[in-house]
Amino acid sequence: MKKSILGVLKWIILLMLAIVMLVPFFWLISSSLKDKTQFYSNPPVYFPIPMHFENFVNAWVNIGFFRAILNSLVFALTFTIIVVFSSALAAYGFSRFKFPGKKVLFVILLLSMMLPTQIMTIPLFLMFKKLNMINTILPMLLPYCLGVPYHIFLIRQFMNIFLYGGAIRATPEALDEAAKIDGCGTMQIFFYIIGPMSTPTLIVSALLNFIWAWKDVWYSNIYLGRPERQTISVRLLSLIGDKSVEYGQMMAATVMMMLPVILLYFCAQKYFDEGITITELK
């Protein structure tokens, strides 16, 4: 009896949390179908009648949605590949090799996670301006070619604790020796053994990086001044005028902007959940 009551309470709490999390999405979709008068109506309109689907068409045309989506896709995919690959290599080096100053470097890496990236914005902007890289995606990619501290730490922890822990019941030396006997070099061990076995964590890292790049406004707004080069998150700002804001179009554009990320998550949900579970188990 006591267990059944606790079970019911658990589901009630989960249901309430789900409602709290879904309300913003409902309000976003509802707002994307409103006109200006419905936005300012009192009491608020939750189910707009009539529904103004023209907000989606107007947003698509006014902000150059197709070009902006392509820009975001190119930037997000390139950023994800660079960060995941470089972070995985750095994590492999920290977790597998012994070299002078290793612990000091790793402590510096952890300390750098505590610093806001915005403090380097002005020096980086001045440097990239002298290199004539403004209005390209290079300033948003080059600083991350050596890996992002958080993802280096995440992948390193996976390699150290899970990969060489209870998963394979073998020491790193034994695994490496077996691979070397088969003729594998250091990079071959990484690509053919460590990489595939770290797939769940790599996918989690890739998803987090893709989402960050997709929604980035700070760096995109600083380095991409030309409208034809701007990503979708920056183009949304063009709907904010000096005297008015096109709320309906902005909400409609936000809904369309979210769809690729939601689709990506559902396609990779299995690996994402597995990677999160592994991270928790460590």
Positions of PLM-derived features:
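A structural signal for multi-pass alpha-helical bundles of membrane permease subunits
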Residues: K2-K282
